[in-house]
Amino acid sequence: MNTVQKAIELILHKGLRKYKSKNSKAGLVSIANQEKFESKVLNGKKNKKGSIFITRKKEDLRAKFGTRGVVLSSEEAVLDHVGQASHWTPNVYNFGTYGQNGLRTIVGHTEKNLQQINCFVIDIDSKSFPMTAINDVALNAGFGVPTMILETTKGYQVYYVLDKAVYVSNNKNFIAIKSAKRISQNLREMFADSLPNVDLTCNHFGFFRMPSVQNIVMFFEENVYTFKELQEWSKRQDDNKGNEQFHNVIESPFAKNAPVEQPKQMDELWFKQVISCTNVSPKQTKAGRNNAIFTLSLACFQSQYAIKDTMDLMDQFNSNLEQPLEHTEVRGIVMSAYSGKYQAAHKDYIERLLQTYGMGQASAFRAPSVLWKKHKKQRKDRVRSHWHEWEADIITFLSMNSNNKPVLYFTQSELCEALNVPRSTLNTVLKKSTKIYKTVEGKGKTAKTGLSTLGMLIAFALKENGKRRESYLNYLQGLFPKTGNILEQAKTSNVMEEQETLYGILEGLPAG
């Protein structure tokens, strides 16, 4: 079984039939035995199988007549489409069918038709950092390394796979979906705190890149998560944010960045045009309902409008839509806009909304072009920061500048200047940190400090083969004992596909 097949079967959690009902390549005996098994009642419940959806190319997701694709109801059919399909729904639906217009328009990929939730996917539209930074962000946040990372045209998609599927029912008003959405949103925000262009508004259970031989850059088969542990982690994240929805954003400690001092966007013509629109389409990926509400909420944030009042305003806007969102989803979008990661609505997104719905252009737009972008707190505002905050900065700096090298070398002066950190603080951080690997070359003023992170070292080790790889990983397990499970999996993993030439033997690691 190859890596792609392992990944797909792991994600689907037996939510589809094993074999195709027609034209299967499997033997008759295998098909008969499998059908007998699938017809059994397990734990008092029917062994129900569902469907997923795929599209041949990205453009099919936003076709004028609806999403164009194929409905698949067996693992065999899914594997037949590997390399041919661009996107899929990794979470399984109860059924799928086609529209009546004869253009292979697919129908059924809605939340209330979800059968089971298999995984959470984070979409990052940037390659301005090495892939290892994703693992470093997760580890630095006290969370686990992803199950799988796919490389896309513009960036990466990060998969966190559940150890077993969470089944959806309409009991208690689809409570599993609500809980899963909070987990998904908190995962996105965790990465958005450190990495650029994390998509915070795309459908949590929609279409994502389908795994293929070409796009899998990391896969740890055993690195799966229980829904319960993710729920507990998500609740802690929500508790840390505080009960911000009842405070004015300027007074709330939840806001890390104050709104920009510009003319209020709520007073501009485009805001009045967008908020009056009722035909915002759910099928528009870049100018749909989520993006409209997010853009309007950011304008409210920039205008120093209280978050409670923004909630009411967006609820009213949503209710006026021809196809409104759920109230809980609107609330989540507003909270993301008020999270402090952004300062105002961005011109590009405003223009896209106006052009899509025929309202002209935002000619009176005044906001700076750098907005709708995460802004870190200025160092001058963090003079008395704790050592672990400096540690996070160093890890981010190393990850962003690694260029797939296992170790980066600096003099202490160079590092202090790059991070604007006092030398005494730097020494304290490097002494206390269990997440940064340090080695020193030379003596005195000419000495250079080599620094690395676990993500950088794992990526380097996985480039090697056989005993050399095992030797490196055993050494890393000694350096970072808490990550033993991940490193054990890495010893047999061969899916880190690197295009660059292998680097020389890492100083300080055994020669193997």
Swiss-Prot record:
Disulfide bonds: none annotated. One of its GO terms (molecular function) is DNA binding. GO terms for biological process: DNA replication. The keyword Oxidoreductase does not apply. InterPro entries: PriCT_1 (IPR014820). It comes from the Bacteria. Keywords: DNA replication, DNA-binding, Plasmid. The keyword Cell membrane does not apply. Essential for replication. Binds specifically to a 60-bp region corresponding to the putative origin of replication of pXO2. Also binds nonspecifically to single-stranded DNA with lower affinity. This is Replication initiation protein. It comes from Bacillus anthracis.
